[in-house]
């Protein structure tokens, strides 16, 4: 079937910001789709609110709209294209996760698609409904002869209670049309049911929840399937969850292909999956179906399906080399599977099901340390913020590699402290899944538990437990052997052990380098295998490699020789986590593409299956490997050998992937690896407070005063000397507590007692905190002789809120010419003083007309993609070229950088871009079910970001809020309760809200201040105050939970009752999903955004239009 000739213009909806449950995998999917559609001659319009994505680069679509993904804004895009005589023919919603699917459903239901004659392709409305609606899907499973868990769809709490009475406790609560298990959970008591079902009904766009019998402890499997318009179906991959039912699949270790299924069970699952796919009606494209098997009797039930490309699709694509999103896009425009050629073999068609001769393991990355008090129990609500994937010739090798890929400070088993407790305690702990369960399983086996005891306690299949048991036996061999001989060392490496693990068991080898030296002496190195989709039946034309230690010393590597071009290795950023996300992958991808175009051979090393960088055709070669010193060095040697007789490896880039590669720079350089760009010594200089302070002193640049304390008395003296408030950050942290702003001595003592372990080895840093200062972020390039300012961003929140969590505007909204010139001079002095070659990010605070330097990072920052989108200058591409020898003058001449001027001087008519952080507070709860605090501070907590662009700040800010959290209210009630120090500053914003017609609620002190300033308000009592006969008021929290508040303005108090009151207020706002502003500056910005919304003139603008304006 040829491509449909009636389709000329396709709209692709992206997935928006990185969220828990919906992450970078959809950038990978969407980027693939856009490239394929344009290659087929179609015009592509894209809408996505996330500036950190590759897909929102202007070259991937004809019209790129960085706009909120709501039915309103998507309709504005469709209308704008129609008005310009450029009608959109079809909407492809299956590549942007749940966000895109839900938006497509709304556009269908509100008639927008019919109004503009836009067809849904990939999955029609009925198929989406049948796949996503719990009851309809259950009916389909029954119709095709399958079985579902006993359950009922409920629309009211009364229906929920009746269903629970019938099924008995525990039950699983699952809302419809949500992602990452949001709102779902296991309810063990009537109280759990009331809370979870109430929130689930609120979380579900269709206002219903499924109450389901508990299948906790069953084995969980997934199938990834694809279907074309001629009803050809392929099963791309089977995936088995290491963890049993009850742990969300995104939080589970998963294995491909499935390890413990019999062929009979697999064939039954496959047949059922294909029948369901046909009955649901996914005409073209991919879908994911989840199954559960009772380990006691083999009963098979169908859990759910995603009638779209999903998180598992990205994993399956990277695991097999079968590009699901790319093929789904081709199927959506009319091709059939037999007409699509496999990119890796270049000769087999896509209707050949992939075959694996290796094992793939994915493991989740958690960030519980960022949310003190959050319950770390793993449940049906997804909590992980990222993931790593590894490939090996056997399960245990792949498991070892993925454990060291997670970058948790360990290199696998035995490289950290052992779990605590006697055997009975460890087995009891295994009954409640947590992120430390792998270590508990190994430890339980090591101290005497049987495989059966561990399997029974943990719910993990005995086969997996036995595999870890094999490692425990190997450990005993390693510790007991008088001499570590070649056979035992080779077998240890074959079982996935890192040099660090072996060194931990053999102290006489004097650490990792000693093990490495022994391996080199014995000639024990990994071979590099190729992912080829067909178990070596056909030759792979795409160099996509993974390492394995073979028992046969004569095993050959599959890295092909390449002697013509100089090789550049690019170290990626590893698993996403809070503080190091997709923004760094963006810079790595840009480096790969631009350096390939410049004539280098690019080699990407990364272990994150969600990203564009690990697509097999992003770089010239891809190694899916852990980003550790050992693994990177082995790849370097393999590439050097493959380039013998030619230029070989001419450089390794560590500057673009965030902290992970930077942490390897010094050791790699000492091992003889050529680091290009800013040298490791310069990176160290910028991070050393004393040395960097000397650079600032020589340049005459002020920085906030600070001191190091090794006791509370010393900390108290330093704080008294430099003045409160102070910012304290311990060098050794307990319980995940990081930095905190402290306003008085009592709070300082409480914080140090609670959060730190002070000693001469572990001092605490006490910084003067610049209250009410404006924070400024600068991204710049330096080639050693010239500095190019990429962009100057003004933070909307005050200094003290982590820059990754603060909204910011570009160009700056309140800075004058003299301020920006001061920023330029300071940035130039720092770049030359540190010795930067490439990118530099500097953070400043402006207070009382003095510009203070807060910190400098000589690397790509998380704002690089945002600045690049806002200014039309590809900073990461320019950085890569500079690191390999190009000058800023040459890049200006080529048109890569602006020919004159730079990002410090923006045109007067330049649109305003606002970046807003997206925070995951609603995902985390305390052990008692209470919400965690949504207060912002110096510790970063956001998972992603959005961007709003408009011709004025208010409209841009309103867009950013709509994209991140939903629209700001245009009317209704605002609750205000602020600290005394903020009351004067908040008078004007609150007065403006009252003038706009908002009703104001306030607690006693705030209400009194507002009335004195002529602002009418209604008083409510504080949460911790008891009602009395003379003040029978309802509390602020009661008003919020009753749905009577549309926005909250709440700034934090001290540590006593009001502080707790603030926590309860903010938690209620998060649970009710209403805007909650916790800074004065945020309140002022929100008021401007509300005014813009009320004016009703917020339009849409493509990046191509924006960039043509800026260039002209």
UniProtKB/Swiss-Prot annotation:
Binding residues annotated for Mg(2+) 1, in chain numbering: 290, 304
Q: Catalytic activity annotated for this protein? A: hydrogencarbonate + L-glutamine + 2 ATP + H2O = carbamoyl phosphate + L-glutamate + 2 ADP + phosphate + 2 H(+)
Q: Can you give the residue ranges of the MGS-like domain? A: 966-1112
Q: Which residues bind Mn(2+) 1?
A: 290, 304
Give the EC number: 6.3.4.16, 6.3.5.5
Residues the record lists as binding Mn(2+) 4: 855, 857
Q: Which UniProt keywords apply?
A: Amino-acid biosynthesis, Arginine biosynthesis, ATP-binding, Ligase, Magnesium, Manganese, Metal-binding, Nucleotide-binding, Pyrimidine biosynthesis, Repeat
Task: Give cofactor(s), names only.
Answer: Mg(2+); Mn(2+)
Region named Allosteric domain: 966-1112
Binding positions (Mn(2+) 2)? 304, 306
Q: Pfam family of this protein, just one?
A: CPSase_L_D3
Region (Carboxyphosphate synthetic domain) residue ranges read: 1-407
- Report the InterPro entries cross-referenced here: ATP-grasp, ATP_grasp_subdomain_1, CarbamoylP_synth_lsu, CarbamoylP_synth_lsu_oligo, CarbamoylP_synth_lsu_oligo_sf, CbamoylP_synth_lsu-like_ATP-bd, CbamoylP_synth_lsu_CPSase_dom, MGS-like_dom
Say which enzyme class the record assigns: ligase
Q: Any note on cofactor binding?
A: Binds 4 Mg(2+) or Mn(2+) ions per subunit.
Residue numbers binding Mg(2+) 4: 855, 857
Residues annotated as binding ATP 2 are 729, 768, 770, 775, 800-803, 843, 855
Which residues are noted in the entry as Mg(2+) 2-binding?
Answer: 304, 306
Question: Does the keyword Nucleotide-binding belong to this entry?
Answer: yes
KW Ligase (keyword) present: yes
Residues annotated as binding Mn(2+) 3: 843, 855
Quote the function comment for this protein. Answer: Large subunit of the glutamine-dependent carbamoyl phosphate synthetase (CPSase). CPSase catalyzes the formation of carbamoyl phosphate from the ammonia moiety of glutamine, carbonate, and phosphate donated by ATP, constituting the first step of 2 biosynthetic pathways, one leading to arginine and/or urea and the other to pyrimidine nucleotides.
Q: Entry's NCBIfam families? A: CPSaseII_lrg, PRK05294.1, PRK12815.1
| Subunit text | Composed of two chains; the small (or glutamine) chain promotes the hydrolysis of glutamine to ammonia, which is used by the large (or ammonia) chain to synthesize carbamoyl phosphate. Tetramer of heterodimers (alpha,beta)4.
Q: What name appears for this protein in its UniProt entry?
A: Carbamoyl phosphate synthase large chain
Q: What is the scientific name of the source organism?
A: Mycolicibacterium gilvum (strain PYR-GCK) (Mycobacterium gilvum (strain PYR-GCK))
What is the name of the gene encoding this protein?
A: carB
């Amino acid at each position: 079937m040829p491509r449909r000739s009636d389709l000329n213009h396709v709209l692709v909806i992206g997935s928006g910001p990185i969220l828990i449950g919906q992450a970078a995998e959809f950038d990978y999917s969407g980027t693939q789709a856009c490239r394929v559609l344009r290659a087929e001659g179609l015009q592509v319009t894209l809408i996505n609110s996330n500036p950190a994505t590759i897909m929102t680069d202007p070259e991937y679509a004809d019209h790129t709209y960085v706009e909120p993904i709501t039915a309103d804004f998507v309709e504005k895009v469709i209308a704008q294209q129609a008005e310009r005589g450029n009608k959109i023919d079809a909407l492809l919603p299956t590549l942007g996760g749940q966000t895109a699917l839900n938006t497509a459903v709304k556009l269908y239901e509100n008639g927008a698609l019919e109004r503009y004659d836009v067809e849904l392709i990939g999955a029609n409305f009925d198929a989406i409904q049948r796949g996503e609606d719990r009851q309809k899907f259950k009916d389909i499973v029954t119709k095709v002869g399958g079985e579902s868990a006993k359950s009922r769809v409920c629309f009211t709490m009364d229906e929920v209670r009746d269903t629970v009475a019938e099924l008995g406790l525990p039950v699983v609560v699952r809302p419809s049309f949500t992602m990452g298990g949001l709102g779902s959970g296991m309810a063990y008591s009537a109280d759990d049911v009331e809370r979870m079902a109430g929130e689930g009904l609120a979380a579900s766009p269709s206002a219903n929840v499924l109450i389901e019998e508990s299948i906790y402890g069953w084995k969980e499997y997934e199938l990834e399937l694809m279907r074309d318009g001629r009803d050809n179906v392929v099963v791309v991959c089977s995936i088995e969850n290491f963890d049993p039912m009850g742990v969300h699949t995104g939080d589970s270790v998963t294995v491909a292909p499935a390890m413990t299924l019999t062929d009979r069970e697999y064939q039954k699952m496959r047949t059922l999956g294909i029948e369901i796919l046909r009955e649901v009606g996914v005409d073209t494209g991919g879908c994911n179906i989840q199954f559960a098997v009772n380990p006691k009797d083999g009963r098979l039930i169908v859990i759910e399906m995603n009638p779209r490309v999903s998180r598992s699709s990205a994993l399956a694509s990277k695991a097999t080399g079968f590009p699901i999103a790319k093929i789904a896009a081709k199927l959506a425009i009319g091709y059939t599977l037999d007409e699509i050629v496999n990119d890796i073999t270049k000769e087999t068609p896509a209707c050949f099901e992939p075959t694996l001769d290796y094992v793939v393991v994915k493991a989740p990355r958690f960030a519980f340390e960022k949310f003190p008090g959050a319950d770390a129990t793993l449940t049906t609500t997804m909590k992980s913020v990222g993931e790593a994937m590894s490939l090996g010739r056997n399960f245990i090798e792949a498991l070892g590699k993925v454990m060291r890929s997670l970058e948790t400070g360990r290199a696998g088993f035995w490289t950290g402290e052992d779990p605590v407790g006697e055997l009975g305690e460890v087995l009891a702990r295994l009954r409640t899944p947590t992120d430390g369960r792998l270590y508990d399983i190994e430890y339980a086996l090591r101290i005497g538990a049987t495989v059966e005891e561990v399997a029974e306690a943990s719910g993990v299949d005995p086969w997996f437990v036995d595999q870890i048991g094999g490692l425990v036996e190997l450990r005993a061999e390693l510790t007991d052997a008088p001499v570590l001989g070649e056979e035992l060392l080779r077998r240890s490496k074959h079982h996935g052990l890192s040099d660090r693990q072996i060194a931990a068991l053999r102290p006489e080898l004097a650490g990792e380098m000693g093990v490495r030296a022994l391996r080199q002496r014995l000639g024990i190195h990994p071979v590099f295998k190729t992912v080829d989709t067909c178990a070596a039946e056909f030759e792979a034309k795409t160099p996509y490699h993974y390492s394995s230690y073979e028992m046969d010393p004569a095993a050959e590597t599959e890295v092909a020789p390449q002697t013509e071009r100089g090789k550049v290795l690019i170290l990626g950023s590893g698993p996403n986590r809070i503080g190091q996300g997709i923004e760094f992958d963006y810079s790595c991808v840009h480096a790969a593409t631009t350096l390939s175009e410049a004539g280098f051979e690019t080699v990407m090393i990364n272990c994150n299956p969600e990203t564009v960088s690990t697509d097999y055709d992003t770089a010239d070669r891809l190694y899916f490997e852990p980003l550790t010193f050992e693994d990177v060095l082995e790849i370097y040697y393999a590439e050097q050998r493959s380039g013998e007789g030619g230029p070989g490896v001419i450089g390794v880039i560590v500057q673009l992937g965030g902290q992970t590669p930077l942490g390897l720079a010094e050791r790699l350089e000492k091992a003889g690896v050529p680091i290009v760009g800013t040298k490791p010594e310069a990176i160290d200089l910028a991070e050393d407070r004393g040395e960097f302070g000397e650079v600032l002193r020589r340049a005459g640049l002020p920085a906030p005063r600070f001191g190091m304390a090794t006791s509370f008395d010393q900390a108290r003296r330093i704080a008294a000397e430099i003045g409160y408030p102070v910012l304290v950050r311990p060098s050794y942290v307990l319980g995940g507590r990081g930095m905190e702003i402290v306003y008085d001595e009592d709070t300082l003592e409480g914080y140090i007692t609670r959060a730190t372990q002070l000693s001469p080895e572990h001092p605490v840093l006490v910084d003067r905190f610049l209250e009410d200062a404006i924070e400024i972020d600068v991204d710049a390039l330096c080639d050693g002789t010239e500095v190019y300012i990429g962009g100057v961003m003004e933070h909307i929140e005050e200094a003290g809120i982590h820059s990754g969590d603060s909204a910011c505007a570009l160009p700056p909204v309140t800075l004058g010419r003299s301020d920006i010139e001061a920023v330029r001079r300071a940035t130039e002095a720092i770049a030359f003083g540190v010795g930067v070659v490439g990118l530099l990010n500097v953070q400043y605070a402006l207070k009382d007309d003095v510009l203070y330097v807060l910190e400098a990072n000589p690397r790509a920052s998380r704002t690089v993609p945002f600045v690049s989108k806002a200014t039309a200058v590809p900073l990461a591409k320019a950085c890569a070229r500079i690191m390999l020898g190009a000058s800023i003058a040459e890049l200006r001449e080529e048109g890569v950088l602006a020919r004159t001027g730079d990002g410090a001087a923006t045109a007067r008519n330049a649109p305003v871009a606002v970046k807003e952080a997206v925070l995951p507070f609603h995902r985390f709860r305390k052990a008692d079910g209470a919400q965690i605090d949504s207060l912002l501070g110096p510790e970063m907590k956001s998972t992603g970001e959005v961007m709003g662009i408009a011709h004025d700040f208010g409209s841009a800010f309103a867009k950013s809020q709509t994209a991140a959290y939903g629209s700001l209210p245009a009317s209704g009630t605002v609750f205000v309760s602020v600290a005394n120090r903020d009351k004067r500053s908040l008078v004007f914003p609150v007065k403006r809200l009252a003038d706009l017609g908002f009703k104001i609620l306030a607690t006693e002190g705030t209400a009194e201040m507002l009335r004195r300033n002529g602002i009418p308000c209604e008083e409510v009592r504080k949460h911790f105050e008891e009602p009395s006969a003379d003040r029978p008021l309802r509390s602020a929290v009661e008003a919020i939970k009753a749905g009577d508040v549309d926005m909250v303005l709440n700034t934090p108090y001290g540590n006593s009752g009001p502080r707790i009151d603030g926590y309860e207020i903010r938690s209620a706002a998060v649970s009710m999903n209403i805007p909650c502003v916790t800074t004065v500056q945020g309140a002022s910005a929100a008021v401007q955004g509300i005014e813009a919304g009320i004016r009703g003139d917020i339009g849409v603008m493509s990046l191509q239009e924006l960039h043509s304006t800026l260039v002209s």
